[in-house]
Structures are given as C-alpha cells and as structure tokens.
Amino acid sequence: MTRYSRITGTGSYLPPNRLTNAQLAAELAVKGVETSDEWIVERTGIKARHFAAPDVTSSDLGLEAAKRAIEAAGLQAADIDLIIVATSTPDMVFPSVACILQHKLGIAGCPAFDLQAVCSGFVYALTVADAMIKSGAASKALVIGAEVFSRILDFSDRTTCVLFGDGAGAVVLEASETPGILASDLHADGKHVGILCVPGHVSGGQVLGSPLLTMDGKAVFKLAVGVLESAARATLAKAGLLETDIDWLIPHQANLRIMHSTAKKLKLPLEKLIVTVDEHGNTSAASIPLALDEAVRSGKVKKGDILMLEGVGGGFTWGAVLLKY
C-alpha cells in the first residue's frame, strides 16, 4: 500500500511584546533613525510585529507552538518520532534547536535536527518530513519554524529593521493512506548569497564580520516574484491540478506587495490570499506555519481545502508545497 503524509494539527506562538510601527518609530528616533507608520505600511503592509524578551530563545517559542500542534492533532509528545526545526536564529551554534526542544518536550530517542533555508525553511522542512514519512523512516513528525530575528537586526538601518518579527509555528505531519502533501518543488541559487545574509562568523572566540542582517531589497523583490510563480506552477503540474483548484494561497509573509504580485501572476483573487504580515511582520521560517495556524483556527481553512504554501529566502532559496488539508 502506498504511504502518504498529511497535516493533522497546527499550532503557533507569538511573544507577548507587540510593537506597533509608531512605537518602533519612536524607539528608532531616539537613535537618530527616521521612519513612520505611513512609510512602513506603504512599502510593506506591516503595521506591527512581536519581539521576544532578551532571555527567550527560538526553542522557547517553538516549544509553545509545538505543544499546541500536538494537542490539535490529538497526540501526546511521546507519540512524536521525528522533529525538524527550520530556523536561522538557533539558541546556540550547536546542538540544534530541535534537540533542545525535544528535551523541553520531555521526550528522547527520535531523530531531531535543524534545517537552515532562511525564509524558505518551513517548505524545505515540510518536504523533508514528507519524504521521511513516505519512506517509512517516521510516522508522526513535528515540523516547526521558529525565529528570533530581532537579535540579528541592524536598528540603524530603517530599510530592514522595520520588516522582521519573532514567532513560531508548527504542524504535526502523520502517515496517511490518502494523500495530504500532493507535491513540492524546492530550489536554490547560491550566486545570490549576498543579497540577503548575515555575513559574520565565529572564529577564535570572536565574531568576524557583521553579525547583523543585510539585504538588497530591490534585488530580493525582483527575484522573489518570478521564482514564487514558477515554483507554484511546478507543484501544480506535478499534482495535475490548475490554479483554479487552489482554495488558499499561504505564502511567506515578507511583504504585501510581493504577496499581491504572486497572487496576481497565479490569477488568484486576493480573497484567496492568507495575510498575517500586517500583524506579524516577516518572521522568516515561522511565517508560513504561523499564517497556516491562524487560518485554520479562524475557520478560513477547512478540511479538504487545497493549500499552496510558498517560501523564498536567503541563499537564494525558494520552494512551494501543495497540499490537501
């Protein structure tokens, strides 16, 4: 019998500190950096974001999202036999956030590892978990996107520091006799490493190079719109479906203009676009599972709906997953 995988539970968590554009602008003004609510909303669609407290880590955020996803799936933590965490902001250089989170869940033994594809991380992680379940290597996988991007922001650069937020989202992916994950399409092109990166690295007890995020916004925008369309069309072709079969488009929540452009290229009405970037900002690998969980819990996404998940991020990486919820 053919083995498939499907999502059986979703969960998410945002740190309680919500920062509006006006509040962020006031904090930046003290440092001599000028911005405003109008400037941010016009260019990004972002109105607020959440920042974690200094002592809160990606594993802390991921733990809360994981607990909610496990509960939604009707499982216990001990039922999980695979943990994959997509993150670019780990608690430490090593071991992985997944191993730390596994211990916090009170379980041991199952494989646990991190996956780093920046803002594409969740679609990469979901694809890997799907493949492992189909191969028989796992039956109940916990797939998490968790980030504390506030730690790597340059608050003297108004073009980047206003974009990002912290948070976590998670899904439980279980073995199934009927298809849930219908198709996926992943890509990368390393020649674009420099347009979105944190170039610093640790050497001899010191950080060499900048430990803060740097981005060429125009280059990212130009690349993102094209590759998101191509990845979406590739997954549809693999699944034998059409754009009109998509019930909900859940893209990486980076910028409202990119999201609207992608929907337009796929000839999807904006009513089919799940948007959380206005309240969450760009939470990198956490953005897609955060948006998915919010859409499920609000009643928008229902069982049987066809969902297109899309991510694009540093690397340059991009990809899409088409699934039946």
Curated annotation (Swiss-Prot):
Subunit structure: Homodimer.
GO molecular function: 3-oxoacyl-[acyl-carrier-protein] synthase activity; beta-ketoacyl-acyl-carrier-protein synthase III activity
Cross-referenced NCBIfam families: fabH, PRK09352.1
Protein function: Catalyzes the condensation reaction of fatty acid synthesis by the addition to an acyl acceptor of two carbons from malonyl-ACP. Catalyzes the first condensation reaction which initiates fatty acid synthesis and may therefore play a role in governing the total rate of fatty acid production. Possesses both acetoacetyl-ACP synthase and acetyl transacylase activities. Its substrate specificity determines the biosynthesis of branched-chain and/or straight-chain of fatty acids.
Name of one Pfam family that matches: ACP_syn_III_C
Keywords of the record: Acyltransferase, Cytoplasm, Fatty acid biosynthesis, Fatty acid metabolism, Lipid biosynthesis, Lipid metabolism, Multifunctional enzyme, Transferase
Family of this protein: Belongs to the thiolase-like superfamily. FabH family.
Catalytic residue positions: 119, 252, 282
GO biological process: fatty acid biosynthetic process; secondary metabolite biosynthetic process
Domain comment quoted from the record: The last Arg residue of the ACP-binding site is essential for the weak association between ACP/AcpP and FabH.
Pathway(s) the chain acts in: Lipid metabolism; fatty acid biosynthesis
InterPro entries reported in the protein's UniProt record: ACP_syn_III_C, ACP_syn_III_N, FabH, Thiolase-like
GO cellular component term of the entry, any: cytoplasm
Keyword Lipid metabolism attached: yes
Residue numbers spanned by region ACP-binding: 253-257
Chief place of localization: cytoplasm
Species the sequence originates in: Polaromonas naphthalenivorans (strain CJ2)
Full protein name: Beta-ketoacyl-[acyl-carrier-protein] synthase III
Superkingdom of this protein's organism: Bacteria
EC number(s) per entry: 2.3.1.180
Annotated compartments: Cytoplasm
